[in-house]
Amino acid sequence: MFKKKSIKYSLAPQTEFYDSLSSSLSWKPFIMFGNFSNIRNTHCNTDSFGLRYNNFNNEKNYNNINNSIFDEKFTSNKEGAVLIGNSAAFGWGSTSDQNTISSLLNEKTKFHFYNLGVSGFSGFQEIIQFLSLQKKLNNIKKLIILSGVNDSFLPYYIKEFDENLGPFFSNSEFLNRMSKASLSLKAKFEKFFYNKVLRKKINWNEMYELDFHNKNSNKNYQFSDYKKKLNPDTSLKFLIDRNLSLWSIIGKGMNIKICYALQPLANWCGKELSIEEKKIFDELDQIDHSRHILSLIDIKKYDLVKNLIIQNCKKYDIKFMDCNESIRKNSHHKEWLFL
């Protein structure tokens, strides 16, 4: 029996490519994951660092493994700038590199924007990304952070994460896989017993920590005695404050102007959906995973996140704009904007 084709793929064929990109991450040290390098596709092209081009041209020497968006030349009347963030900044769903936000900003402003966006990044990963590439960014005058959505729900979506570093996509997979490799022989036997015999799901990161303490402590160690239960509201407030504090330090240290733009969501901007948006969102509502995430980014969460970002942007002297408010003011009702 033939599988029914996705409505999303029928209406926006390019999203099939982007979904395959999202499910096949390029694992990286420190930053956890990123875009694949040297992608050559009708819809998306990346350089040797996995960074997206603004205007890929096959006729140029781009097949070289050392190619970089930082080699792109721009006229003397343009100043260097950076767009960073997650899927919106990267350009998830755009039909081509030329239709990404960074490319359109290049056309409409006096700046040449380097696109450092990566789908799925948390706010802290965005900071690590920028710092890792800082030496390649010469004469940057402006930085736009198009972000906020992932940070708004990750502390509520990821059950176990480092209190200081914060949550990220594939957090649980990372902890469990790293911990499994470090278990003692006894713990590995227990793993086999629980998985194969009792068929119980075990948090192997907790078991690894428990195994260490029981071998090296003078008392019987219970994990619940020491494990701090994280409050997602508290984590969200801390992460937004910490991230904007770091961006402020970066901006002042590099003498660049920073603008934090809260990225838009269909249910946050309050627009009337287009026919295409309704069909795509109705299909997503049938998927448990998508429905769960949508429940974590409702209007109440929008108000909370927006107010926290505004508060901390004022605190750290960072310009703020709300893309949702801009869409509301410009009455994009029934226009097809979201995938």
Residue ranges and their predicted role:
Residues 1-95, 99-107, 329-331:
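Membrane/wall-proximal cationic-aromatic binding patches
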Residues 78-79, 110-112, 138-142, 254-259, ...:
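Loop/turn elements at helix/coil->beta-strand transitions in domains of secreted/extracellular proteins
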Residues 82, 90-186, 191-194, 198-204:
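Conserved SGNH/GDSL esterase-like catalytic core that processes O-acyl groups on lipids
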Residues 88-95, 115-116, 233-237, 298, ...:
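Second-shell loop/turn segments in exported
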Residues 115-117, 262, 322-325:
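Residue-level recognition of beta-strand->loop/alpha-helix junctions
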Residues 150-308, 328:
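Serine-dependent acyl-ester chemistry module
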Residues 308-322, 332-339:
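Histidine-centered active-site loop/cap adjacent to the catalytic His
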